[in-house]
């Protein structure tokens, strides 16, 4: 998600929502999603502006979430509480993410060092569902649950390359790229060519697209029908690795790990659903 972006609480136009759609629930979830590394705490008016609600509606949702233990308040500023972590951990364990994904990610890190992640496409963003790394400081931290613009990551570009032409056209027509670094590609025509090249090559490389100091190589994880359901990457520090070095040294291992994961998820129906398109 690009900095300053307003949270879309439904992801659908009003006339596309099911009759049973619960607006109040969507508002509450939207408020939880509005807190991130850039907005760790906010006033009532800031929350309302981020989610696109009236202050009165935002206040009702915040009070409900506060009563349930998901949101805390310090003076006039609201923040998330640790109970929010239970929502993500329930998915992690019930879907088999730790059992299926983490072993291969740990093996890649043990073999090459640096970091390895798995992500899925959610709207215009890639969400990191598994991660392993050597413990070093990074500015853009790829922790489980982190959400970043798909156009600026190796994972995201692989996932975009896995879309059919109509879905890719729809994405490119809607996305409004933001320069996260001086090297971030924000021209939509250039992005299209990059994504089509990823589709042809079978892998994606990025250098300083999301943040300075991150060079990454990503490949697709495919389901039983051959469609891209997720992406896997290996990343290092710009200046210590190059895209060419990643391709030469890590691509075979990355492709093998992606194949193992793709075969393994067939044994976990929930994981298939989580990682499906």
What is the predicted role of each segment?
Residues 2-11, 137-212, 277:
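Short, solvent-exposed recognition segments
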């Amino acid at each position: 998600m690009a900095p300053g972006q307003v949270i879309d609480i439904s992801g659908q136009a009003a006339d596309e929502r099911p009759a049973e759609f619960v607006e109040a629930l969507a508002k509450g979830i939207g408020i939880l999603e509005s807190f991130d590394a850039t907005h760790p705490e906010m006033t009532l008016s800031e929350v309302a502006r981020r989610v696109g609600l009236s202050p009165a509606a935002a206040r009702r949702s915040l009070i409900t979430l506060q009563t349930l233990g998901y949101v805390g308040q310090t003076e006039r500023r609201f923040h998330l509480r640790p109970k929010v972590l239970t929502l993500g951990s329930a998915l992690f364990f019930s879907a088999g993410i730790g059992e299926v994904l983490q072993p291969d990610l740990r093996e890649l890190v043990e073999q090459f060092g640096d970091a390895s992640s798995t992500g899925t496409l959610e709207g215009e963003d890639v969400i990191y569902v598994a991660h392993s790394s050597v413990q070093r400081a990074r500015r853009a931290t790829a922790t489980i649950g982190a959400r970043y613009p798909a156009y600026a990551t190796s994972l995201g570009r692989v996932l975009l390359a896995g879309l059919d032409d109509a879905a890719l056209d729809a994405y490119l027509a809607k996305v409004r790229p933001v320069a996260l670094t001086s090297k971030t590609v924000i021209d939509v025509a250039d992005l299209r060519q990059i994504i089509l090249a990823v589709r042809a090559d079978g892998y994606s490389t990025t250098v300083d697209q999301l943040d300075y100091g991150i060079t990454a190589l990503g490949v697709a994880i495919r389901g039983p029908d051959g469609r891209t359901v997720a992406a896997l990457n290996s990343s290092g520090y710009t200046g210590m690795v190059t895209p060419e070095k990643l391709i030469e040294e890590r691509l075979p291992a990355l492709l093998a790990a992606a194949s193992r994961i793709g075969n393994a998820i067939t044994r976990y129906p929930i994981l298939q659903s989580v990682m499906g398109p």
